[in-house]
């Protein structure tokens, strides 16, 4: 099982635009259809992403645990690539066959349509 955990970050929207452009050049692709990942966030902006778990339930439970706060909730689970994008007021998660596809889906759904990648993983 693999994990990334981060606290609250601040970044300019232009960084998110540059990051999406870089993703188009070398976008990680999911390879493990039988592995699950999940992304969790807390009210204070803390978050965690896990991947390589044998079930969606175990992945979500681990993401919440690694998030580390009582307000942590799993935003999603995925067998491909999962991403959470942020802007000043929102966090939006999505998944897709590549990091680029997942990022586009999250940016299309986040209010305002812009943000930056905060957490991501591909199985």
Regions found by a protein language model. Give the residues of each.
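Helix-coil modules at protein/domain termini and other flexible surface or pore-lining loops
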Residues: 2-123
């Amino acid at each position: 099982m693999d994990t990334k955990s981060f606290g609250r970050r601040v970044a300019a929207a232009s960084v998110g635009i540059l990051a999406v452009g870089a993703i188009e050049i070398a976008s990680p692709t999911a390879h493990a259809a039988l592995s699950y990942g999940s992304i969790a966030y807390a009210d204070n902006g803390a978050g965690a992403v896990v991947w390589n778990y044998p079930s969606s339930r175990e992945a979500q439970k681990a993401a919440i645990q690694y998030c580390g706060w009582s307000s942590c909730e799993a935003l999603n689970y995925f067998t491909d690539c999962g991403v959470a994008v942020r802007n000043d007021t929102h966090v939006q998660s999505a998944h897709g066959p590549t990091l680029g596809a997942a990022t586009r889906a999250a940016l299309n759904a986040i209010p305002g349509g812009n943000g930056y990648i905060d957490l991501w993983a591909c199985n």
